[in-house]
Amino acid sequence: MKHTLTKTLLMLLASLLLFCCIGCSGGHSYESDAAYSHLFTETDDDAAKALKNVIIAQLDAYNQGDAEGYYALFNMEREDLNFNVAQFTSMRQNANLSCTPESIDTAFINEDNAQALITMTCRAEDKATGEVLYYYRTTTTYTMVRDGKWKVTLQTPGAEEDLMYTLTATETTTE
């Protein structure tokens, strides 16, 4: 009986430890994902990789239409969160939205603070007509704090490079 109890306690402890390790790792790792592996470099330490995974997960939520998942990274009051989620959901009813990261550079990162520059292309297409509503490239700066989880406290958009002309030129040459 004593041996069985000890064995059960050891199994429970091992399961709890495994759960904590998986739960604390921050979830899915995009480092080996073909769509995102180019965002990681050989010089990235574990902290940079973890931060990049958080940002990619947020953009992935945006692309999947998961408003709650996308806005979960932003440090905002509940009423602001509810407003933004409603706006996002409304936009997604009429348009396909996507933001594709081209690069993520960690400007600095320490135990509780980080700043990352995300260069990405963003695009919206009307669901009914397929018309491209916008298509641009920008570099956005995330200033982040960690209080258990990483949160964006300030999002500073950079200048937008309009890419609509590339669509027009491409469509003109293919028709």
Predicted regions and their residues:
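Bacterial N-terminal signal peptides that target proteins for export
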Residues: M1-L12
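Intrinsically disordered, low-complexity repeat and linker tracts
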Residues: L17, G27-E42, M164-E175
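C-terminal motif of bacterial Sec signal peptides marking the signal peptidase cleavage site
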Residues: F19-G23
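Short, low-complexity N-terminal intrinsically disordered segments enriched in polar/charged residues
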Residues: C24-Q64, A72-L73
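Short solvent-exposed beta->alpha transition segments
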Residues: N53, A67-L117, A124
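Polar/charged side chains located within well-ordered beta-strands of beta-rich proteins
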Residues: Q58, N84-F88, R92, Q155-E160
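K/E-rich alpha-helical interaction surfaces of small helical-bundle regulatory domains
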Residues: G65-A67, G158-A159
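Exposed beta-sheet edge and beta->alpha loop/turn motif
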Residues: E111-E175
